[in-house]
Amino acid sequence: MNELLSKVNRLIRRTAQSLAACEASLQKLNAEKEKLAEKERLYDMQLRYLQSLLDMKELLGEVVFRQDIFYSLRKVAVIQQQIAEINLEKQKIAERRKILNKEIVQQQAQRKHWWLKGEKYDRLKKRIKKQLLNQMLYQDELEQEEKYNGRSQEN
């Protein structure tokens, strides 16, 4: 029985280690997800800024020189290129976030698995301890009965 108890204790330690590894992995994934969200917020701010620059570059019925038109067109092209690059980066972030969400779901399932195993082993340990206690009490009762019967026969 004690050997079984030591095996169960080993299993409990192993499940606790696996559970801790899952927790660490989840924390790492959530931290990465937070960084992605922060990057996306920064890109959104940049997009708003670039869009406002683009809006300011519109020629609204103004009389301008040809060189000013070309200068404005170059500026607009640069701004549009920057907007396209930021949108591409945002797409990459969205794809990475999808992957992270899948990994998080997998890790949560793994964590639940190890937590349930740990609970099962804890219940088993309690049951074994209870059986050991009952066995010891029964053994003690038998010894007491033998002592009592031994004294009775001597008298």
Which residue stretches match the model-derived regions?
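Charge-rich amphipathic alpha-helical interaction elements
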Residues: 1-155
